[in-house]
């Protein structure tokens, strides 16, 4: 594709995204599907360029002055050296790292100035491309041997099931994916899922399951015994979860709709409950740079309250002596350690071990938090 047509599609993507409400990754995917003449090399160029523009949009707009047309933004972007631009002492701190001031100040209130700058800068880089192998169907070394010479891969250092690709590929088109040998999942997300240390024969409830990513990660621990329930308020997510469970060969799991009458019979019966709570998603901004421009920091109190309500509701399903895992993909103490303290003060539970805190600045993974609690044996 010529430079003219690449720039043509780039402008169509940027302008089109600005007028709709889809997440950036889904919008790009839909556009590519509708424009099949765009080759793989140009698809990669368009995606990487758009993601980089959105990562640095705050600084780009600052340098643009009053005009903010996409054409002008793109011209500024092409002259921007992102490795040095943030070092300009004349720039306001939030502009230098290309974050909205409200979100920057919110992060700073929890992490302090130095850690906030470090976090914001790494959030403006590309996240690693990580997958998790399905041990019900294969093992990590077998897949790495299979891909040797075709792709550049390496094993994750902390997740025994993780593999990191040097470059993004058409993973969903691979036979290995269609056969259920792997799923895309950040290494940090895998580690959070492994906090659910379920044993064969136990009962597990994934209370905010979404499309089932974390269930797919811990399901193998039950050795195809016991029962896993996937619950979510979003029916379309559960439809996708059902497809993924089938592809992975997981047969001891069932979908639990939000209004399912069976829910009442499950209270006080679960050995494990996972609460992957709705959150700001601040730990995943490398993958979702558009989110930071949509986030209203004034909503943090509402988010905290929602997390507390969900945790209290989920706790009702844990049997006395059972365990509940609270997890977020956030790096904000407001959603993590502050909530952990609130739960301990307001429920008959105790903390099991130390919480898991993952930051892109330390571990290179996405930012996650996870804490395991045990329900009082006298509660019912």
Regions found by a protein language model. Give the residues of each.
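S-adenosylmethionine
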Residues: 1-380
């Amino acid at each position: 594709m010529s430079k003219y047509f690449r720039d043509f599609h780039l402008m169509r993507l940027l302008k089109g995204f600005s007028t709709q409400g889809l997440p950036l990754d889904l919008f790009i995917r839909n556009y590519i599907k509708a424009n099949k003449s765009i080759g793989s090399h140009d698809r990669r160029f368009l995606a990487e360029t758009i993601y980089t523009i959105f990562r640095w949009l705050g600084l780009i707009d600052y340098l643009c002055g009053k005009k903010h047309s996409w054409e002008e933004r793109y011209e500024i972007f092409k002259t921007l050296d992102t490795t040095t631009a943030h070092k300009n002492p004349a720039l306001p701190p939030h502009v230098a790292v290309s974050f909205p001031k409200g979100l920057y100040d919110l992060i700073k209130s929890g992490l302090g100035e130095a850690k906030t700058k470090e976090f914001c800068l790494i959030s403006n880089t590309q996240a690693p491309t990580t997958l998790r192998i399905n041990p019900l169907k294969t093992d990590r070394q077998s897949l790495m041997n299979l891909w040797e010479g075709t792709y550049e891969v390496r094993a994750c250092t902390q997740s025994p099931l993780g593999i990191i690709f040097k470059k993004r590929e058409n993973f969903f088109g691979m036979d290995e994916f269609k056969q259920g040998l792997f799923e895309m999942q950040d290494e940090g997300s895998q580690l959070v899922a492994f906090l659910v240390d379920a044993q064969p024969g136990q009962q597990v409830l994934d209370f905010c399951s979404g499309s089932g990513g974390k269930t797919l990660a811990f399901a193998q621990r039950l050795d195809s015994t016991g029962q896993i329930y996937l619950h979510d308020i979003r029916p379309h997510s559960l439809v996708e979860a059902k497809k993924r469970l089938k592809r992975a060969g997981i047969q001891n799991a069932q979908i639990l709709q939000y209004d399912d009458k069976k829910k009442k019979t499950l209270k006080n019966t679960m050995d494990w409950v996972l609460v992957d709570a709705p959150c700001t998603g601040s730990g995943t901004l490398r993958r979702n740079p558009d989110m930071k421009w949509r986030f209203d920091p004034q909503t943090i109190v509402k988010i905290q309250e929602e997390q507390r309500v969900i945790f209290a509701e989920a706790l009702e399903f844990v049997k006395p002596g059972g365990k509940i895992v609270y997890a977020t993909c956030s790096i904000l103490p407001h959603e993590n350690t502050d909530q952990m303290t609130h739960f301990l003060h307001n429920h008959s539970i105790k903390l099991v071990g130390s919480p898991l805190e993952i930051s892109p600045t330390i571990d290179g993974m996405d930012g996650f938090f996870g804490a395991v609690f045990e329900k009082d044996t006298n509660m019912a």
